[in-house]
């Protein structure tokens, strides 16, 4: 990608009123994925009224604060290290504080958290007490645009496949590296088969 212009104004049209008109559709979904480009009141509406599992991407530290009031109503959260610090109130300096940040987030009622660690991979934890830290998968870096979105899409897909925490984290890492290997924003080689092969699921 050489240049991109993003007009975020469209998100302002995604009001609670608009979402209410689509409540039946939302509740019939297997999962609903949101990010913090949505207005805070719309995020709150989804947290209060959507019965489908909610997967949330904090997007940035400036916008992540919108999730603080609704953390306990989310199913899955995918913050990076800095966003996890902001939302948990725990400064992450080592493995112990990383685990503490994840546990603090889960204590809100959140079901799963996947903390992106950049070149250190990902740390994942769930309410059952399971925790796993995985390194990034090897790959040729061509373009990092869309890697985070690919990770979020993959962990949502993996949840719908019924995978465990470890394989879900593997799916996220696999999608990220597949996305990274193409000059296109969405790698044409991205597929369910490619994801399964790259992730090397344990089951």
Language model feature labels by segment:
Residues 63-64, 68, 95-203:
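Conserved phosphate-binding/catalytic region of the ribokinase-like
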Residues 1-131, 191-194:
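Ribokinase/PfkB-type carbohydrate-kinase core domain
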């Amino acid at each position: 990608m050489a240049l991109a212009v993003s007009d975020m104004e469209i998100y302002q049209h995604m009001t609670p009123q608009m979402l209410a008109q689509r409540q039946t559709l939302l509740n019939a979904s297997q999962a609903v994925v949101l990010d913090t480009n949505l207005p805070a009141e719309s995020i709150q509406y989804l947290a209060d009224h959507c019965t489908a599992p909610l997967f949330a991407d904090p997007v940035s530290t400036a916008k992540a604060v919108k999730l603080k009031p609704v953390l306990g109503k989310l199913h899955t959260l995918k913050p990076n290290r800095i966003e996890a610090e902001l939302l948990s109130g725990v400064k992450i300096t080592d493995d112990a504080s990383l685990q503490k940040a994840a546990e603090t987030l889960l204590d809100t009622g959140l079901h799963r958290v996947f903390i992106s660690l950049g070149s250190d991979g990902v740390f994942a934890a769930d309410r059952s007490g399971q925790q796993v830290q995985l390194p990034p998968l090897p790959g040729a870096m061509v373009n990092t645009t869309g890697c985070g979105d690919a990770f979020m899409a993959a962990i949502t897909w993996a949840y719908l496949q019924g995978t465990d925490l470890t394989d879900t984290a593997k799916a996220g890492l696999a999608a990220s590296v597949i996305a990274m290997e193409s000059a296109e924003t969405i790698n044409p080689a991205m597929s369910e088969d490619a994801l399964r092969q790259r992730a090397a699921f344990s089951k």
